[in-house]
Amino acid sequence: MHILVTNDDGIHHPGLAALRDGLARDHRVQVVAPDRERSAIAHAITLLTPLRAFSQTNGNGIPSWAVNGTPADCVKLGVLELLGEKPDLVVSGINPGPNVGVNLNYSGTVSAAREAALLGIPAIAVSVSNPYGTHFSDAARFMQDLVADVAERGLPKGVFLNVNLPDVPMEEIAGVRICRQGIARLEEAFHVRKDPRNQPYYWQGSETQLFGESPDEDGVALRENCIAVTPVQCDMTDYGFLNQLKEWKVEKP
């Protein structure tokens, strides 16, 4: 199978290297990834400046390009221009730090997989729970098996998989849980400081993760030491509310 590997942490990140090398054992792999860290950039694409792709070399001879754009740019440019042919699958990761709950909306890792799904290509985003991830090889081993399942069974149109693994040795993981996107999110916080001119500036972020309680949520599964596998759809329409909204009879003024 022909696989495009990408991420949002940059082409030299060890998580990408573990994923690339693991998948290359059984598949034809090419890499198109950002030339630098582009985390939490969501589904941004570059329209006002040109994109540039620089061919990279690595010890295993896998064709690779570093792009001065976003993760979504990398998928779009790779599929439409760089690879020469449409890949069978796009895999984004391995991201250090979880992408569960509300944080799917901010994630460049997840958005790269979403871009592939929008282009009609099956895709998987994969992350480990630790922002300073150390068990990328275990995650890559799991992905080899999951990729084989996707190759055999396929994915519905407009749907991709979001995978989160505990950052522990594989033998310590409790199991695999198929689950829904939950409500987990980082606790909202800004750290206010002063610059040398006594003007305030703000660092956004917190490492406190707020989880739900339902065992079928992705964040709860991860907290309970399970691998969380979630099907995510690109169509964001709320069909349950659609007909109710039509009853509002909204009209132009």
From Swiss-Prot:
Residue sites binding a divalent metal cation per the record: 8-9, 39, 95
InterPro entries noted in UniProt: SurE (IPR030048), SurE-like_Pase/nucleotidase (IPR002828), SurE-like_sf (IPR036523)
Pfam families to which the protein is assigned, alphabetical: SurE
HAMAP family listed in its UniProt record: SurE (MF_00060)
Catalysis performed (reactions): a ribonucleoside 5'-phosphate + H2O = a ribonucleoside + phosphate
Keyword terms, alphabetized: Cytoplasm, Hydrolase, Metal-binding, Nucleotide-binding
Protein's name according to its UniProt entry: 5'-nucleotidase SurE
PANTHER family for the chain: 5'-NUCLEOTIDASE SURE, 5'_3'-NUCLEOTIDASE SURE
This enzyme's EC code(s): 3.1.3.5
Task performed by this protein: Nucleotidase that shows phosphatase activity on nucleoside 5'-monophosphates.
Family assignment from sequence similarity: Belongs to the SurE nucleotidase family.
UniProt cofactor note: Binds 1 divalent metal cation per subunit.
Organism: Desulfatibacillum aliphaticivorans
Localization in the cell: Cytoplasm
Any one annotated GO CC term: cytoplasm
Molecular function terms from GO: 3'-nucleotidase activity; 5'-nucleotidase activity; exopolyphosphatase activity; metal ion binding; nucleotide binding
Cofactor(s) annotated in UniProt: a divalent metal cation
